[in-house]
A protein has these predicted regions:
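Residue-level detector of alpha-helical secondary structure
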Residues: 10-22, 26, 37, 41, ...
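Catalytic toxin/effector domains delivered as secreted proteins or via bacterial secretion systems
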Residues: 38, 42-46, 53-187
Length: 187
């Protein structure tokens, strides 16, 4: 991956990191990943087009499974996208499910972010928590490269490839959280 002029610091960090990863894989496991690995990585990186997606990918490789808590500003954008995708997501997944967290009623719903360029390669599908008035108040997602039948063939191929980094212990899945969620209730 060549560095382009005018890149942000995050872009430069990610480019350097991916170049290092590619070089390490070439030196250590050329026969396992081969030239196709480099092409798929470049293809995948071209799709990671928002600062949030880049941050999530770097976290995957560098934070050893440490939970990420998103900022209020990021959650506001996620919440706006979730509200816009809520009806369409109900057709793909279940509708809102009543949950009680710390004695209060909320509704959790799986939301697909695959139609959102800022969050598709970071969240994919995530659980958003809504208060009784339907206002988003929380987020729970596991950043991983798991198989999913709802993805198109190309996205599933990218996911399968990236999962190999986890299997080789070069990366680790982690939770992405914000506000009200039931993550601690299930662990």
């Amino acid at each position: 991956m060549e560095e382009a002029k005018g890149q942000s610091i995050l872009d430069k960090m990610l480019t350097t990191f991916i170049n290092t990863l590619v070089k390490a894989a070439e030196n250590e496991a050329q026969t396992h990943f081969g030239k196709i690995r480099e092409e798929v990585l470049k293809h995948f990186m071209a799709k990671v087009n928002s600062d949030f997606e880049k941050q999530c990918l770097l976290w995957h490789f560098t934070k050893k499974g440490q939970t990420m808590t998103v900022s209020s500003e990021v959650f506001e954008r996620i919440a706006k996208a979730a509200v816009a995708s809520r009806a369409a997501s109900e057709k793909l997944f279940h509708g809102p499910q009543k949950v009680i967290i710390k004695g209060k009623v909320y509704y959790s719903q799986t939301i697909s972010f695959y139609e959102n360029d800022e969050f598709d390669y970071a969240l994919g599908c995530a659980t958003i928590f809504f208060d009784e008035e339907g206002v988003p108040v929380g987020l729970k997602d596991i950043y991983d490269f798991n198989e999913a039948k709802h993805r198109d063939t190309n996205a599933e191929s990218d996911t399968t490839f990236m999962a190999k980094f986890e299997k080789a212990n070069l990366a680790k899945s982690y939770a992405i959280l914000y506000g009200i969620n039931d993550y601690d209730l299930h662990d």
